[in-house]
Amino acid sequence: MISKLKMPQPTVNIGMVGHVDHGKSTLTLALTGVKTDTHSEEIKRGISIKLGYADTPVYKCYDASGNPYYTRQPSENCELERVISIVDAPGHETLMATMLSGSALMNGALLVIAANEHCPQPQTREHLTALEIMGIKNIVIVQNKIDLVTRERALESYKEIKAFVKGSIAENAPIIPVSAYHNTNIDILFEAIEKYIPTPEYNEGSDPIMYIARSFDVNKPGTPIDQIKGGIIGGSLTQGSLKIGDEIEIVPGIQNTRGNKTVWTNVTTEVVSLMAGKYSYDMIKPGGLAAVGTKLDPFLTKGDAFTGRIAGYIGKVPPISFSMRLEAHLLKRVVGSDQELNVEPIRAKETLMFTVATANTVGVVSNVKGTDIEVSLKYPVAAFNGMRVAIGRRVLNRWRLIGYGVIESLE
């Protein structure tokens, strides 16, 4: 049985970002008690492939001397501060698009840097640039694996980190030394999270907008027809609220072929369950990650098929767009590669990758005028004017982050 309303809903999403194998999933486990890399291929390869997420309560407690400390496991003299959602993003270079789509849900980030490797590693640099590009300012740097190094190396690593973040969005971010494996300094990290990553102010009175990051079929093979559950969509509300019984629309919906034409049909359904972590709710508000049970055929939602879509009230979601005009802001250098390469100007007829909220789509540049670019998209997106869009280019057989654009118009 699912316990009902045992814990308040999470109010903030915190990204876990950094280079592959620097201990992000182990740190998520230390903070939440939840193992996020449970996908079969993730266990086999030892890396995160999909976005993982886990919730944890944060308690402020007082010891016998009256000194405060923070923990997820309360004893006497403890008060619940809030519940937080951790978004565990993959650190492997081939999975940068997944990390970027996750950044659309993040209100703050933990940048994990291993003390036993030189800083910066390629994806450390790439992920920090991604945070900068997506405007995520509330950052705590976690110097992990201090149990594997000498005191001298730990201090040297600290200096490398300070030099690396100088002049960046994380220049003044606190650096917390931890051993995620041994649960060392996790209480200090919780304290830093409470101090430096505040709960945002949400517009709960608006119509709901939910960015979908995952979608599932939770039915096991052989489930009797009368016991089959509808498709599940997972993501985060950025405004408004959703309750059981609400009729919702999902855009872009389903792709069909009619004759020689591809047609996209919006999907409508009813909310039948709402969950955050292991708890069920009658209503969810913005902040944190939630799983929304629907009456959709689970075949439609299986295998993250609805990732990148937007859900909201029927008729209150943005129309789908096959082209967009962006004001482009390019980086000076390509990040994420071992080689130092300059970012060339965007050219007409060039194919680029665009991360629009949780959606990744490829588009061809149809026109360039100064910093403005017009793009025809291979797959449509649901978006709003003014949104930031990450721009990637194929460099040395990998999609690399080259800058961002601000949406000026959509068609």
Curated annotation (Swiss-Prot):
Region annotated G4, chain positions: 144-147
Residues binding GTP: 21-26, 144-147, 179-181
Molecular function via GO: GTP binding; GTPase activity; metal ion binding; translation elongation factor activity; translation initiation factor activity; tRNA binding
Keyword line: GTP-binding, Hydrolase, Initiation factor, Magnesium, Metal-binding, Nucleotide-binding, Protein biosynthesis
Glycoprotein in keyword set: no
Enzyme category, top tier: hydrolase
Region of interest: G1: 18-25
Chain intervals for the UniProt region annotation (G5): 179-181
Enzyme Commission number(s) of this protein: 3.6.5.3
G2: annotated span: 46-50
Residues the entry annotates as binding Mg(2+) 1: 25, 48
The keyword Hydrolase is assigned to this record: yes
Residues given in the record as Mg(2+) 2 binding sites: 21, 46
One Gene Ontology CC term in the entry: cytosol
Domain tr-type G: 9-201
GO BP terms in the entry: formation of translation preinitiation complex
Cofactor(s) demanded: Mg(2+)
NCBIfam families recorded: eif2g_arch, PRK04000.1, small_GTP
Function: eIF-2 functions in the early steps of protein synthesis by forming a ternary complex with GTP and initiator tRNA.
Membership in a protein family: Belongs to the TRAFAC class translation factor GTPase superfamily. Classic translation factor GTPase family. EIF2G subfamily.
Assembly mode: Heterotrimer composed of an alpha, a beta and a gamma chain.
Protein name: Translation initiation factor 2 subunit gamma
Protein source organism: Thermoplasma volcanium (strain ATCC 51530 / DSM 4299 / JCM 9571 / NBRC 15438 / GSS1)
Lineage of source species: Archaea, Methanobacteriati, Thermoplasmatota, Thermoplasmata, Thermoplasmatales
Gene transcribed to yield this protein: eif2g
